[in-house]
Amino acid sequence: MKALVTGASGGIGQDMARMLSAMGYDLIAVARSRDKLEALKQELNTEVQVLPLDLSREQACFDLYNQVKDQNIDVLINNAGYGMYGRFYDTDLEQELNMLRLNIQAVHILTKLFLRDFKKRNKGYLMNVSSSAAFFAGPLMSSYYASKAYVFRLTEAVYEELRREKSDVSVSVLCPGPVDTLSLIHISEP
């Protein structure tokens, strides 16, 4: 059994990797920090392939898929993401667009590519990590909240498509509340 976890270097992704390893899954751990991924690898008792990639770069998403597509991934945890804090009109536009590329575009690309493989095999499990932020307006974190709403709605729609087809492929979305991680970038204080 093999699972791919994005954002595996810390927080929810790291905990998901630990949990999946404890369940006997070999892992493909993806994040920007090779050092943190290597530390995770040393901690786990199953095989761990470390792939340091910046998934906010569109090509990195395709590179990731092409590197692992022949490994018969059973589980994809789309977890990589971060938030920005500040008034919408004050936050740095390029940093915000980078966040949106990671929180939305990477999730979209990886969901589509791996879901196609899961459908061909009629098995697989995909979890997209959203947030309870998906259900609220989110002043001072407007773009982050909107990005998590996208992840929630996309996953909900894909779930419904698969349910109607009576597919054996499973899709779910995790919407945790606030979590003590380093994924919040303080850009500008109100």
Give the predicted meaning of each segment.
Residues 131:
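Residue(s) in the substrate-gating loop at a strand-loop-helix junction
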Residues 87-89, 95-100:
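Substrate-binding pocket helix/loop in short-chain dehydrogenase/reductase
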Residues 23-39:
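Conserved glycine-rich Rossmann-like NAD(P)H-binding loop of the short-chain dehydrogenase/reductase
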Residues 9-10:
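Conserved glycine-rich cofactor-binding loop
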Residues 52-63, 93:
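The beta1-alpha1 cofactor-binding region of Rossmann-like NAD(H)/NADP(H)-dependent oxidoreductases
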Residues 111, 147:
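Active-site helix of classical SDR
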Residues 185-190:
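Residue-level detector of conserved catalytic or cofactor/ligand-binding positions
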